[in-house]
């Protein structure tokens, strides 16, 4: 259960026991008037709550954790996730008054968890956020590999490791009943670019900015990208401020847990940015998807309380628009350009790389796992179909 789109939630059932994988949401299509969020139908889960042993989370992106508050209000299922993912979930649950009552179990790669007839082994994978996991799920019916969102980055950023292909291959040799694999980039040939590409692309843009203030918009959960920006700010002698509620809470949490490294003498508050000349400031902000109430959107509308955008600003949108968000992103870009800023967006420079496997990485996963059955997941039907064709 849970296939056919890009916001993820799956339920595995064997011999009367059940486990859940992920609990995501998506934003509505343009024609879904009056709808703020799209969440899963939890009816089957709630009807079988006594049989559900736990909920495993692959990583901390919205399309994998965003619906947790709505499930936990009705069913306080135990959550199994990596350390950073738990931190991101807690930030989200704080907004709903649920953080103190949620039941968390921290998991790590290669440390197996047995719940009912299921034995689940977390496997490290590369993605655009630290602590991303695949799961090998052993049960009486056989072994299932659930990749979650993944790519294979052979030159990962400092602190990360290459996707654990040997463990995938080990399961392949033993025998894999089914592989459920990320289909997001199934239409793209070749390999996904390394995160190192972004570091070099953004470094060139920092030079291009000259004496202007730099504003970088990215996903608040993209801890890798935030670290890259902080490192470049230090290289160029700039102070760093963050704007946007989720960006502030996530950066604070990631620093506390040791996933984000930023010296105290580099960080300043948003209220302090005007105390420094433009060439001494980098502002990291939310709003890369043109969200109406995000910090970057408010800047584009000249309604941000602390930031007034003008000709002295060099703005980098370090993310590609999620399908369906193109118009809102364009509106924000137009607003920023109207105010006199220079804006770098989409494919103008190497400011973003995908966190998802392209066709050659998908072939590698299929070859190593060597499953009896293959279920493409995490994609629109055309992507699922292309992934099936690749297999």
Regions found by a protein language model. Give the residues of each.
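His/Asp/Glu-rich metal-coordinating catalytic cores
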Residues: 1-56, 61-276, 294-308, 327-331
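C-terminal regulatory/interaction regions
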Residues: 231, 235, 254-391
């Amino acid at each position: 259960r849970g296939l056919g789109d890009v916001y993820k939630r799956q339920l595995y059932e064997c011999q009367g026991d059940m486990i859940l994988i992920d609990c995501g949401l998506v934003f509505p299509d343009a024609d879904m008037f009056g709808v703020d969020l799209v969440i899963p139908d939890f009816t089957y889960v709630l009807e079988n709550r006594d049989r559900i042993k736990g909920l495993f989370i692959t990583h901390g992106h919205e399309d994998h954790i965003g619906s947790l508050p709505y499930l936990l209000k009705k069913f306080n299922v135990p959550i199994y996730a990596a350390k950073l993912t738990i931190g991101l979930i807690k930030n989200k649950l704080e907004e709903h008054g649920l953080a103190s009552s949620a039941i968390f179990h921290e998991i790590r790669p290669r440390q197996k968890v047995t719940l009912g007839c299921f034995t689940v082994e977390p496997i490290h994978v590369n993605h655009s956020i630290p602590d991303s996991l695949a799961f090998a799920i052993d049960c009486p019916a056989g072994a299932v590999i659930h990749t979650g969102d993944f790519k294979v980055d052979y030159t990962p950023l400092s602190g990360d490791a290459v996707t654990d292909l040997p463990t995938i291959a080990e399961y392949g040799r033993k025998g894999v009943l089914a592989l459920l694999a990320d289909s997001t980039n199934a239409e793209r040939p070749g390999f996904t670019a390394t995160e190192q590409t972004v570091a070099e692309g953004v470094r060139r843009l920092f030079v291009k900015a000259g004496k202007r203030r730099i504003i970088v918009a990215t996903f608040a959960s993209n801890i890798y990208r935030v670290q890259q920006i902080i490192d470049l700010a230090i290289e160029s002698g700039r102070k760093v401020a963050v704007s946007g509620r989720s960006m502030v809470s996530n950066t604070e949490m990631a620093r506390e847990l040791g996933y984000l490294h930023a010296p105290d003498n580099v960080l300043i508050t948003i209220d302090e940015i005007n105390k420094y000349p433009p060439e001494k400031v980098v502002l990291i902000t939310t709003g890369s998807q043109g969200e109406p109430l995000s910090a970057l959107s408010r800047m584009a509308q000249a309604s941000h309380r602390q930031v007034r955008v003008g000709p002295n600003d060099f703005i980098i949108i370090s993310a590609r628009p999620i399908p369906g968000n193109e118009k809102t992103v364009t509106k924000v870009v137009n607003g920023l350009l109207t105010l006199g800023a220079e804006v770098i967006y989409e494919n103008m420079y190497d400011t973003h790389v995908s966190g998802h496997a392209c066709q050659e990485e998908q072939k590698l996963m299929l070859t190593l796992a060597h499953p009896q059955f293959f279920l493409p997941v995490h994609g629109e039907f055309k992507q699922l179909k292309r992934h099936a064709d690749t297999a």
